[in-house]
Amino acid sequence: MKRLKAYLKDGINVAAVMCLGDTISQFFFDKKSLDEWDAGRTLRFGIVGLVFVGPTLRRWYHFLESRVPKTYSPMRRGVTKMLVDQTLFAPPFTMAMSFLVPLSNGEPIDRIRQRILDSYLSILVRNYMLWPAAQMLNFRFVPLGYQVLYAQFIALVWNCYLSMILNS
């Protein structure tokens, strides 16, 4: 039960930040008025955070913690975790998000496939402009129990970008 609560807590935190990111994206980047705001889109983006992003990140960070030797210096552990995260996790996670967000908005699979072909590489390149440094700080200085929350503060900016690209 304690483990379920931890997953739920992370899922709720991630959902809230993703909803905020989508709302910011709609108002500031899409220039929508309050009457034009697509609350359903915001809710769907948040649900992806609740059921996929939060639990996935929690599991991934615990996996990294268990696999990177604790005998490494703190700096080496942080660098190792960041490199593994950005090489093994970021590409498939980005692909999953590129699929799930449009799917949650009811886009047909053929359109999602084309969207991925058109935007996946540019999203991944931009991922590498932000996340390696952010994750290095996360894995080096943030205690394991707070790593998902820390990542979500960084993700507020990232989610605005993702929402803008994946909901266009």
Swiss-Prot record:
Q: What are the record's GO terms for cellular component?
A: cytoplasm; mitochondrial inner membrane; mitochondrion
* Impact when changing R41Q: Decreased channel conductance
Report keywords, A-Z.
Answer: Membrane, Mitochondrion, Mitochondrion inner membrane, Transmembrane, Transmembrane helix
- Topology in the membrane? Multi-pass membrane protein
Q: In its UniProt record, which GO terms are filed under biological process?
A: homeostatic process; mitochondrial genome maintenance; mitochondrion organization; monoatomic ion transmembrane transport; regulation of mitochondrial DNA metabolic process; uridine transmembrane transport
> Pfam families this protein is in?
Mpv17_PMP22 (PF04117)
Q: Membrane-spanning regions, if any?
A: 12-29, 41-61, 82-101, 144-166
Q: Which branch of life, at top level?
A: Eukaryota
Gene ablation phenotype (knockout): No effect on lifespan under normal conditions but reduced lifespan under stress conditions such as starvation; adult flies show an increase in glycolytic flux. Reduced mitochondrial DNA copy number in the fat body, but not in skeletal muscle. Mitochondria in the fat body appear swollen and lack inner membrane cristae. Conditional RNAi-mediated knockdown in neuronal tissues results in significant defects in learning and locomotor functions in larvae but no defects in adults.
The record's subcellular location field reads: Mitochondrion inner membrane
Any idea which GO molecular function terms this record carries? channel activity; monoatomic ion channel activity; uridine transmembrane transporter activity
Site note Determines ion selectivity applies to: D85
Q: Which InterPro entries match?
A: Mpv17_PMP22 (IPR007248)
What this protein is reported to do is described as:
Non-selective channel that modulates the membrane potential under normal conditions and oxidative stress, and is involved in mitochondrial homeostasis. Can translocate uridine, but not orotate, across a lipid membrane. Involved in maintenance of mitochondrial ultrastructure. May be involved in mitochondrial DNA (mtDNA) maintenance but does not appear to be directly involved in mitochondrial deoxynucleoside triphosphate (dNTP) pool homeostasis. May be involved in the regulation of reactive oxygen species metabolism and the control of oxidative phosphorylation.
Sequence similarity: Belongs to the peroxisomal membrane protein PXMP2/4 family.
Subunit structure, briefly?
Part of a larger complex that may be a homohexamer.
Its protein name is Mitochondrial inner membrane protein Mpv17
